[in-house]
């Protein structure tokens, strides 16, 4: 894993992918949710800016489509509910594949990363806002003052994982 100046981590989603840009030199984040068209424009702009400034860039995409088996059903789901869940999961997987395809087309270095283990206290094992703040504090990173949603938190966690910095919690 080579060191990079800027890490763009993406948690693909139909309604708006979570995007976290981590600047290694300042240890600062830029985060938000973007639809696929806006994300493609953002990646083009960021690539051009990095080339002009002489920074290296990598895009990390959470690639849940690489997991061979995902179980999203509960015991009381009807057939219609099961079909709707499967359709939604498939649509999210396709967004991730399309982001990877755009990166390839735009000649932007990217990695497809298996989802990180869900070992947090938040809903469905996802990281909560408080846990993310504790993690950033434990890593001596500047505190994040804005609000976050699950997609943004997952993207931030992906970026921190890719950064190579030791992940430490501070309670």
Regions found by a protein language model. Give the residues of each.
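Phosphate- and other anionic-substrate recognition elements at nucleic-acid/protein interfaces
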Residues: 2-171
